[in-house]
């Protein structure tokens, strides 16, 4: 036999030496039960690769990797991804730069992720851009961020993406409020991916504003107490779209940081050490691949 083609998942170690007559078990290639290598030693290096096609030519001892988009199952693709864009300041500090240099990547990187997600068939991205707690940062950093978010119109107005902003807009600078209104109006008819940007947003805030709205309607006779249920509460939340299937947080932290607290009840979480400015197509696909290997039960049992 002159060649052998393998379908394998991410390697558990970055480099393997395949010796003559060596058996490789599931510990090395997840999904491969046993692989017999009959010829001379070969070095396998696959750091950072996701599910790949490995072609071992046993005559030339040449090893080829080919990334394969078909590895993602279209039927198991998450419809809605929530994204916590963390690690921008650390990215800048690691490079000896001012923190603002890290923040500058937020809007272009978000646009890149939307473009990739659209091609993959993802319908909604909800991105956590500025929390209700971020006001505690220095005035200089807050002012920079809020001014930077005015770039959303230039970046997305002609992208085919529909943009919605959630959060307490009344506390934002008037110039940013006008930019938000213009962006939402300009893109509302777009049929592509729906990008929801959480700006001056917090899960506590969203739950409280929904509760106040329901109480006011009840006090004014617009609904009875018996009418209050989960579906009604969902309608009063600012997100107003299906709950996320997958939450991705970049930057290594493993918490939700007051993001979509109600909506994340049955969301699958994925945490990566990759800092947001470095988060790219392969990182997104790896997160989705991880998601597609999970068994979502929503509180039930299917043994």
Swiss-Prot record:
Location, primary (coarse class): plastid
Xref: Gene3D superfamilies: Decaprenyl diphosphate synthase-like
EC number: 2.5.1.28
Location in or out of the cell: Plastid, Chloroplast
Magnesium recorded as keyword: yes
Transit peptide: first to last position: 1-54
Residues the record marks as active site: 86
Cofactor names: Mg(2+)
GO cellular component terms given for this protein: chloroplast; chloroplast stroma
GO molecular function: dimethylallylcistransferase activity; magnesium ion binding; prenyltransferase activity
Domain of life of the native organism: Eukaryota
Pfam family, one: Prenyltransf
Entry keyword set: Chloroplast, Magnesium, Metal-binding, Plastid, Transferase, Transit peptide
Record-linked InterPro entries: UPP_synth-like, UPP_synth-like_CS, UPP_synth-like_sf
Protein task: Uses dimethylallyl diphosphate and isopentenyl diphosphate to catalyze the cis-prenyl chain elongation and produce the 10 carbon product neryl diphosphate.
HAMAP family per the UniProt record, alphabetical: ISPT (MF_01139)
Family membership noted in the UniProt record: Belongs to the UPP synthetase family.
PANTHER family: DEHYDRODOLICHYL DIPHOSPHATE SYNTHASE FAMILY MEMBER, NERYLNERYL DIPHOSPHATE SYNTHASE CPT2, CHLOROPLASTIC
Protein name: Dimethylallylcistransferase CPT1, chloroplastic
Organism: Solanum lycopersicum (Tomato)
Name of encoding gene: CPT1
